[in-house]
Design a protein with these regions (language model features):
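Hydrophobic h-region of N-terminal signal peptides that target proteins for export
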Residues: 19-29
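A "functional boundary" signal
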Residues: 27-184
Length: 184
């Protein structure tokens, strides 16, 4: 009888702990969704995508996220969905063509929907950093100069900020510290 009561107590405690953790995680996700001003369903699914970021399944999950965001007329989450596909290829670092393709896909969508944050992030923090990490500093510099020219022509502060940051990184990698300092 005593053993039976202890196992019931342990089972009750386990249920309580599970429910507590479930509701705590749910409340946290809802708060984050509210903080980022995004639909809680989209945000929850985005988090699931992030959990699978290094697995090929994230590509189809990102397509689903894109469609869900499209149904809710959420252009920002559509950009995030395409960016997630780019992130998968960037972190795999095995297919340069895919990195270029998805960088351009993010840029095209971001340009069409006036979201420079995603436009310049994809270009600088994915494509140019990919080149930099693979020792291709001249191509990285070429892309950064193209990006700088465009950001200057459009007087885009987000783009200029990303350009200065990436130029500094490129010159640091090239061990041209005086040039790197100029871009900081």
């Amino acid at each position: 009888r005593k053993h039976h009561t202890m196992s019931q107590t342990a089972l009750s405690f386990t249920r309580f702990l599970f429910l507590f953790l479930f509701f705590t995680a749910s409340v946290k996700a809802q708060k984050e969704a509210k903080d980022f001003n995004v639909d809680s369903t989209l945000y929850a699914y985005y988090q699931r995508c992030q959990e699978c970021l290094l697995q090929p399944v994230v590509l189809s999950m990102s397509d689903t996220l894109y469609r869900m965001a499209e149904e809710r007329h959420d252009k920002r989450m559509q950009a995030v969905a395409i960016s997630t596909q780019l992130d998968y290829h960037y972190f795999q670092a095995t297919n340069e063509d895919s990195i270029i393709y998805y960088t351009n896909k993010v840029k095209d969508f971001a340009k069409a929907t006036q979201q420079p944050k995603y436009y310049y992030f994809a270009w600088s923090n994915r494509l140019i950093l990919y080149y930099l990490k693979n020792g291709r500093t001249n191509i990285a510099l070429y892309e950064a100069q193209k990006m700088l020219k465009e950001a200057q022509e459009e007087d885009d502060k987000t783009g200029l900020s990303r350009c200065y940051n990436i130029m500094s990184q490129i010159y640091t990698v090239k061990r041209l510290d005086s040039m790197a300092f100029e871009w900081q």
